[in-house]
From Swiss-Prot:
Substrate binds at residues 11, 34, 61-70, 117, 179, 188, 208-209. Catalyzes the decarboxylation of orotidine 5'-monophosphate (OMP) to uridine 5'-monophosphate (UMP). This is Orotidine 5'-phosphate decarboxylase. One of its GO terms (cellular component) is cytosol. Belongs to the OMP decarboxylase family. Type 1 subfamily. It comes from Streptococcus thermophilus (strain CNRZ 1066). It holds the Pfam family OMPdecase. The active site is at 63 (proton donor). The gene is pyrF. The keyword Lyase applies. GO terms for molecular function: orotidine-5'-phosphate decarboxylase activity. Keywords: Decarboxylase, Lyase, Pyrimidine biosynthesis.
Amino acid sequence: MRENRPVIALDFPTLEDVKAFLAKFPADEKLYVKIGMELYYAAGPEIVRYVKELGHSVFLDLKLHDIPNTVKSAMRVLSNLGVDMTNVHAAGGVEMMKAAREGLGEGPILIAVTQLTSTSEEQMRDFQNIQTTLQESVVHYAQKTAEAGLNGVVCSAHEVAKIKEATNQDFVCLTPGIRPAGAAVGDQKRVMTPDDAHQIGSDYIVVGRPITQAEDPVAAYHDIKAQWNDQ
């Protein structure tokens, strides 16, 4: 189920910024983009409709986490927007994840967040009071996500091999925190290069600032895409 296009994180504050960014790409180049909280809360459902009308694929990254019925209802709305992928927090529990799957339907890819890539093992133990290793926590969440009938998880590339071993090889692993070699890591604690993620078995990678803030975003995108596809 591997996606050969890097997913571009559209971390912009307005729809106009998104329009300006996407206009840099040829009209016939269909991208896979991530719309996160900032952009969705600023622009609303219109941002999803706009991007879909251009023919791009959309990962709507809202990380829903609420009681099962509320999440089910919200997912029904997102399904009507035509998103290609969306997510929930695995910490919401198996029943919540099952409700999310029911609300979204079987078409779009539904994944769960395990531990955020900004979370260190020390932070997890101190704040969340989870007294295992970070990897054990992530694998546990992944197993529960599979049990709930979801397609996969958001995880660091460091955990991909263990997750697929604990679930199955078709279980989707989407990896954020991807940086080209030599790029600044920002606020991500656990990062890898596109080639590293390819070699370790990630199915999707998410790349933001190295593309969106590049002097030439189109060239940066194609360079990262080549690294991701080991070309």
